[in-house]
Amino acid sequence: MIIRQARSTEIRTLAALGVIAWEQAFAAAGEVTNHLREKAEATYFGFCEQYWPIIIAAEIDGETVGWAALEPGQNKITDVWVLPNFQRHGIGTALLSELEQQAVSREFDEVFLETHAKNTPALSFFKKHEYTISGLKSAYSPTMDKSVDTLEMRKRFN
């Protein structure tokens, strides 16, 4: 596995990967509809098109299988996505570790993120990596096209 900077030539691939992983995460909660899928596709493409220089990608045998991003100049993790068939193989852990190293190199003493309160696999993943819940909020989500409950999670570095 290689963790590397994303390339401008793979914006569509990154966006599609994000949508596939998003669908898998929310299908179990009955949250995915064709309308939401279209909104998710537009949201992910827009994000990847604008922010590809800050995205890191995980590659296995020449295939991009995951990506993640840390907000520029901040300590907020915006995304961690891994294709469903490649989950539970250490890819998310490698991406998360790289983002944490970036935050430390920027002299931050912690990182934080927000995740959908019903995204049980994500909550378990981040708890496993020593993230703790630090807040709950309800806000409009462009991807979900409604107000959703999100949990803020933090990890402090010693």
Where in the sequence are the language-model features?
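Acetyl-CoA-dependent GNAT
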Residues: 5-85, 96-98, 102, 139, ...
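Short Asp/Glu-rich motifs
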Residues: 33, 37, 122, 145-146
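Conserved glycine-rich acetyl-CoA-binding loop
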Residues: 63, 79, 83-97, 104-106, ...
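C-terminal "cap" of GNAT-fold acetyltransferases
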Residues: 109-112, 116-120, 127-132, 136-158
